[in-house]
């Protein structure tokens, strides 16, 4: 807290707080294993998270959905142990945690490829903290349904905008007098009402409106992007969407 006092957070307190906030989806109390971490340290961390999972499950005396979080670092056997133990509690959904913590892309992909389709088919599958368009495509391809990430708003605050043709950096000089919207095919509030030049001007002046408009656009882009993924799965055209995203977003 702001006064500097130390607070003890337990699994029970975590659940109590989430219930008080009225969370639509609650998460168990867990430890996000750092990277790099050797197998002994990772296993100890995983076991602590499993212990807290049991306590979180017992503390939830409501009908609010509670998700389990699979830990185990970069070790497939530990991930599988974590998953098998969590399944015993029949959580309303299952999340992959402990990724996007500094590990190389190839390691993260290996973990997702190994564990993604092992998650229960009848429960939501949630990948925590991963949000680049190409990473989302890869994860969906391996059975993941849900994501959360700071990328849309954090990148917006730094002038990086996601468009149907790839990334646009509004701080580039070439946009100084560009009277087009951020993305001419976008129907978000920012694109319908403001030009690239004006948003760039606001950003250069450190006007908070710039960050808000760019955040509105990026969040809208991601909502539309997930809609395109759902539609492509229904229409059996996911591979075509994957090729398009690879073409536009391979560099980030």
Residue ranges and their predicted role:
Residues 1-61, 173-176:
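Non-catalytic, usually N-terminal nucleic-acid engagement modules in DNA/RNA processing proteins
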